[in-house]
C-alpha cells in the first residue's frame, strides 16, 4: 500500500520544482531538454525567431542560448506551443477522459478547461471526484471550472445539488 504524501511534503516538492525551473530559465543549471536551432513564433512582435528552447519539468522555461542534459538539433524547424481549449464539457464527448486525450493530443491540444456541470448534475461530488481522478495522469493538462448550474434549472430534477 502506497504511503500518501503529506501536505507539507507536497508543498515542498512543488516548491523545489519551481525553484529548479527558475534556475534553468536563468541559465544557472542545464535544462532537462534543449531544442537547438529552433524557429518559433514571438506572438508579441509577430516575428519568427531562431534560437534554443529550454524545457524543464515539462515546461518551456526560456528561449535564447541554453545547454541541456539532452539536446536535440531541430535544424530550424518551426516549433509551436500546444493549443488550449478554454471551455469544454469533457463529459459531452461521450468518451472517457483517457480516450478524449488520445483524440485531441495528436491535433495539438495540450490543455483543456472543462466545466463538469453535466456529470455534477447526475452524480454530484462523486462525479466531480471521478473526473479529477480520471484526468490525473493524462498527457493533456485538464483544468476544472466550478459548475455554475447545478442543478441546471429550478424545474429540473437532476439528482444532485452542490452545496
Could you describe each region identified by the protein language model?
Residues 10-81:
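Histidine-rich, glycine-flanked metal-binding segment
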Residues 39, 57-59, 88-90, 116-118, ...:
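Short glycine-rich, polar/acidic loop-and-turn segments at beta strand-coil junctions
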Amino acid at each position: 500500500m502506497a504511503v500518501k504524501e503529506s501536505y507539507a511534503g507536497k508543498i515542498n516538492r512543488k516548491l523545489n520544482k519551481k525553484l529548479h525551473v527558475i534556475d534553468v530559465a536563468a541559465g544557472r543549471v542545464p535544462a532537462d531538454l534543449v531544442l537547438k536551432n529552433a524557429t518559433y513564433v514571438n506572438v508579441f512582435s509577430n516575428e519568427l525567431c531562431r534560437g534554443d528552447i529550454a524545457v524543464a519539468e515539462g515546461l518551456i522555461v526560456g528561449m535564447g542560448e541554453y545547454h541541456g542534459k539532452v539536446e536535440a538539433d531541430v535544424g530550424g524547424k518551426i516549433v509551436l506551443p500546444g493549443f488550449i481549449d478554454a471551455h469544454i464539457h469533457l463529459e459531452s464527448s461521450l468518451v472517457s477522459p483517457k480516450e478524449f486525450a488520445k483524440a485531441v493530443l495528436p491535433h495539438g491540444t495540450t490543455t483543456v478547461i472543462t466545466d463538469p456541470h453535466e456529470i455534477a448534475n447526475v452524480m454530484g461530488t462523486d462525479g466531480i471526484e471521478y473526473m479529477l481522478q480520471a484526468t490525473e495522469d493524462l498527457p493533456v493538462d485538464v483544468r476544472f471550472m466550478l459548475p455554475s448550474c447545478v442543478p441546471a434549472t429550478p424545474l429540473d430534477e437532476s439528482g444532485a445539488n452542490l452545496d
